[in-house]
């Protein structure tokens, strides 16, 4: 009897003994090298990471985890840099068969549509005078989903109408169509491409290195968010087209990381000083809103409406702002759009966290006037955070919610505005 037969008989006898004792041995289909998908780790023995605070309560621990996550998102580089606030971006979606994989809690395709919709809203919230176009790639062919314009609702409607995935992905075809869409952009606007790449291969019809050289010649920046693994050609594309931007290529490790990598592209890129030309004025129009008694066709969509905005140059009516006038090509915006884009040039400084050891005297938040937590009784907790955050300019103390609101929405300090700084 050989060794294989002996091992088989021993396994068989072991299983028979277990069945007699009323125990059934369940064998896992997963090996030690492959313990499961990444999202499953969030639900396996999650009670092991629960820890009580000094008073035996879980409320303080949960609040601390939430606050640490908020603070991590706020700690950004606030160095004032020259940035291109008039942006033109092409968002490329992967609609190949690889997006049917379920290595996240949801399918890659569903997660892509969800976070792409959030990206569109956040992009126009942070860059109101910019324009966006969407391209989808399936069966190795690039399809234009939306044209280059500044209406976020139109982009989201087209995204939600996508259903099918098929074939392979083609980096070269996607980049060539994106380059053709951005070729007519003036020099004062940025040219950017953001690719969601869920495959590990690219079915290209020609030499992609010639396409990379053309992108560098046309000053087009490419950022790629990978969903499967790091691909060498993607890294080379990002390195060659982003001379001043680091970490332009990232591979997601979780659903939250996927969202964070996408939203990083909402911040305008820094301008390369070596390629910067002399500053020039850009002509823009500030139209007046009109309300008509009888509906008339707009110049942008040819849809009858009673209200809109009249171009100050050619008097053509458009539905929404910002937009480029379809008749005279004048950029039509509101003054609030410029104000919302201005904060990227001079970002609000990060507020420092005040520990109990600093003996803070403030009892209420300067902005919302809610009371701060009381000092700890035991000296062991003096090294923990006091839930106070101080502005380096006005020295006032604020709570975490006001800190988040000031940096993500208002982009101004409450104390500095009150003191006139």
Swiss-Prot record:
Location relative to the cell: Nucleus
Keyword set, alphabetical order: DNA damage, DNA repair, Metal-binding, Nucleus, Phosphoprotein, Transcription, Transcription regulation, Zinc, Zinc-finger
Signal sequence, start to end: none
Domain VWFA, first and last residues per copy: 88-267
The protein, known as: General transcription and DNA repair factor IIH subunit ssl1
Major place of residence: nucleus
UniProt subunit comment: Component of the 7-subunit TFIIH core complex composed of XPB/ptr8, XPD/rad15, ssl1, tfb1, tfb2, tfb4 and tfb5, which is active in NER. The core complex associates with the 3-subunit CTD-kinase module TFIIK composed of mcs2/cyclin H, mcs6/cdk7 and pmh1/tfb3 to form the 10-subunit holoenzyme (holo-TFIIH) active in transcription.
GO biological process, one term: nucleotide-excision repair
Originating species: Schizosaccharomyces pombe (strain 972 / ATCC 24843)
PROSITE patterns membership: VWFA
Biased composition (Basic and acidic residues): 1-21
Zinc fingers classed as C4-type: ranges: 311-328
UniProt KW Mitochondrion keyword: no
Region (Disordered): 1-35
UniProt modified residues of type Phosphoserine: 15
Pfam family, one: C1_4
Cited CDD domains: BRcat_RBR, vWA_transcription_factor_IIH_type
């Amino acid at each position: 009897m050989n060794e294989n037969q002996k091992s088989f008989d021993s396994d068989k006898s072991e299983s028979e003994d277990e069945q007699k004792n009323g125990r059934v041995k369940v064998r896992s289909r997963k090996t030690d090298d492959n313990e499961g998908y990444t999202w499953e780790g969030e639900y396996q023995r999650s009670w092991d990471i629960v820890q009580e605070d000094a008073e035996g309560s879980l409320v303080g621990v949960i609040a601390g985890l939430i606050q640490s996550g908020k603070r991590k998102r706020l700690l950004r580089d606030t160095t004032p840099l020259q940035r291109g606030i008039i942006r033109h971006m092409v968002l490329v979606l992967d609609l190949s068969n690889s997006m049917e994989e379920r290595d996240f809690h949801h399918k890659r395709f569903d997660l892509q549509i969800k976070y792409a919709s959030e990206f569109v809203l956040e992009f126009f919230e942070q860059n109101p005078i910019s324009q966006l176009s969407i391209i989808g790639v399936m069966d190795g062919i690039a399809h234009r989903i939306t044209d280059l314009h500044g209406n976020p609702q139109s982009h989201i409607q087209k995204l939600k109408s996508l259903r099918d995935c098929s074939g392979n992905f083609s980096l070269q075809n996607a980049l060539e169509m994106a380059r053709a869409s951005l070729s007519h952009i003036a020099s004062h606007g940025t040219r950017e491409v953001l690719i969601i790449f869920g495959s590990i291969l690219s079915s290209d019809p020609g030499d992609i290195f010639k396409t990379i050289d053309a992108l560098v010649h046309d000053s087009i920046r490419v950022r790629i968010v990978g969903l499967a693994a790091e691909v060498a050609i993607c890294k080379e594309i990002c390195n060659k087209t982003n001379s001043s931007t680091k970490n332009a290529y990232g591979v997601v490790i979780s659903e939250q990381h996927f969202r964070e990598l996408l939203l990083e592209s909402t911040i305008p890129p820094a301008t390369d000083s070596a390629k910067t030309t002399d500053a020039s004025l850009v002509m823009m129009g500030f139209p007046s809103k009109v309300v008509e008694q009888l509906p008339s066709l707009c110049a942008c969509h040819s849809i009858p409406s009673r209200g809109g905005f009249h171009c100050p140059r050619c008097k053509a009516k458009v539905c929404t702002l910002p937009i480029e006038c379809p008749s005279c090509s004048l950029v039509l915006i509101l003054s609030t759009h410029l104000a919302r884009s201005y904060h990227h040039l001079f970002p609000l400084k990060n507020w420092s966290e005040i520990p109990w050891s600093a003996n803070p005297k403030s009892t209420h938040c300067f902005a919302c006037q809610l009371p701060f937590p009381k000092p700890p009784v035991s000296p062991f907790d003096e090294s923990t955070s006091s839930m106070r955050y101080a502005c380096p300019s006005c020295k006032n103390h604020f709570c975490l919610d006001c800190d988040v609101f000031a940096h993500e929405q208002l982009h101004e300090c409450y104390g500095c505005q009150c003191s006139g700084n």
